[in-house]
């Protein structure tokens, strides 16, 4: 499980990539994850929620606080109860460079 403020995703239209920040208003997000000692860790993804599918076809599998123990204990059929609450907005293309790492990357444009 990964606790995050949100995530970036890029909408592609021909040769143009537009970055968006996805988040849950007034809450942190918990991403479902997997871990293996020899190969490391990864965020589990799923098909995008209807309200963000026009930006990208996949998103992290989101857990609410009540689903965390279910995920950790091995229940892998998780209801996607947070999907309808997701919000997003366009952000600066500065997020495209790993050289940039400041709070302004989260600013709405």
Give, region by region, the residue ranges found by the protein language model.
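A structured binding-face within diverse protein domains that lines the active/interaction site
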Residues: 3-109
